[in-house]
C-alpha cells in the first residue's frame, strides 16, 4: 500500500472505527460530516484516492460499498467461545450487546473459514439445505459474497439468511424452500449489507 496523506489516514481510521463499532462502513455523507467536508463529493474523491493506493476497495453503486482488504472486525477469541445472537434489534449492529443471548463453548477455528458468531435461525426458509428453525448458524464476518454462497444480509433494518446471487446492480436473496419467494434488491435504489457467510450449522 502506498503512503497515505494525513487526511487519508484520518478517513481510513474513521472507516475502521465504523466497522468495529457498527459492523458496516460509513456512507459518503457520514464521512463528510465527520471530517468537516462541505459535500459527500469531497469524501468520494478521497475514497477514490484511497482505492488507488490500495488502502480500500469500493463497490460501485453501493452507498456503503467500502471494504478494507484483510480487515475483519469482531474476530472471536478462541478461549471465550462464540457469542450466540438471537433476534437482532432493528438497525442495531449484529454483535450489539443487546442481541447476544449467551456464549457457546466451541472453538471458532472448528469452522473454515473461522466463525465469528452464531446466529439463531428464525423460520424455515432454508430448510431444504438443512438450516432449520432454532438452529445455530455459524457465521464468518465478511462484507464480500460470491454467487451461490449462503449469506447473512441486512436490508434496511431487517436481517435475513439466504443464498446470494448478483448480476450487475441487481441482487437476489434466494430461499431454499419453494414456499418463499426470492427477495430482489436493486443496489441503485436500496442498500444491502453483507454481514457474513454461513460456515456451518449447529443443532441442539
UniProtKB/Swiss-Prot annotation:
**Keywords on record:** Autocatalytic cleavage, DNA damage, DNA repair, DNA replication, DNA-binding, Hydrolase, Repressor, SOS response, Transcription, Transcription regulation
Query: Catalyses which reaction?
Result: Hydrolysis of Ala-|-Gly bond in repressor LexA
UniProt GO MF annotations:
DNA-binding transcription repressor activity; sequence-specific DNA binding; serine-type endopeptidase activity
Positions of the record's site feature: Cleavage: 90-91
Write down the species.
Pseudomonas aeruginosa (strain ATCC 15692 / DSM 22644 / CIP 104116 / JCM 14847 / LMG 12228 / 1C / PRS 101 / PAO1)
Where are the catalytic residues? 125 (for autocatalytic cleavage activity), 162 (for autocatalytic cleavage activity)
Provide the assembly information.
Homodimer.
Q: What is this protein called?
A: LexA repressor
Gene Ontology CC entries for this record: protein-DNA complex
Q: What does this protein do?
A: Represses a number of genes involved in the response to DNA damage (SOS response), including recA and lexA. In the presence of single-stranded DNA, RecA interacts with LexA causing an autocatalytic cleavage which disrupts the DNA-binding part of LexA, leading to derepression of the SOS regulon and eventually DNA repair.
| Lineage of source species | Bacteria, Pseudomonadati, Pseudomonadota, Gammaproteobacteria, Pseudomonadales
Question: EC number(s) in its UniProt entry?
Answer: 3.4.21.88
Name the DNA-binding stretches.
28-48
Designated gene of the protein: lexA
Amino acid at each position: 500500500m502506498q503512503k497515505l496523506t494525513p487526511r487519508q489516514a484520518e478517513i481510513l481510521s474513521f472507516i475502521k472505527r465504523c466497522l468495529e463499532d457498527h459492523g458496516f462502513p460509513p456512507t459518503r455523507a457520514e464521512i463528510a460530516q465527520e471530517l468537516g467536508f462541505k459535500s459527500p463529493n469531497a469524501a468520494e474523491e478521497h475514497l477514490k484516492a484511497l482505492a488507488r493506493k490500495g488502502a480500500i476497495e469500493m463497490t460501485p453503486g453501493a452507498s456503503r460499498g467500502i471494504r478494507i482488504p484483510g480487515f475483519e472486525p469482531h474476530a472471536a477469541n478462541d478461549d471465550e467461545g462464540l457469542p450466540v445472537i438471537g433476534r437482532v434489534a432493528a438497525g442495531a449492529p449484529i454483535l450489539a450487546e443487546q442481541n447476544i443471548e449467551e456464549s457457546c463453548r466451541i472453538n471458532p477455528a472448528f469452522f473454515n473459514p473461522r466463525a465469528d458468531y452464531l446466529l439463531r435461525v428464525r423460520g424455515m426458509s432454508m430448510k431444504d439445505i438443512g438450516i432449520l428453525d432454532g438452529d445455530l448458524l455459524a457465521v464468518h464476518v465478511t462484507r464480500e459474497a460470491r454467487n451461490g454462497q449462503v449469506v447473512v444480509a441486512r436490508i434496511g433494518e431487517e436481517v435475513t439468511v439466504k443464498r446470494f446471487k448478483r448480476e450487475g446492480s441487481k441482487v437476489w436473496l434466494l430461499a431454499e424452500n419453494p414456499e418463499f419467494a426470492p427477495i430482489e434488491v436493486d443496489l441503485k435504489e436500496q442498500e444491502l449489507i453483507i454481514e457474513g457467510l454461513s460456515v456451518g450449522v449447529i443443532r441442539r
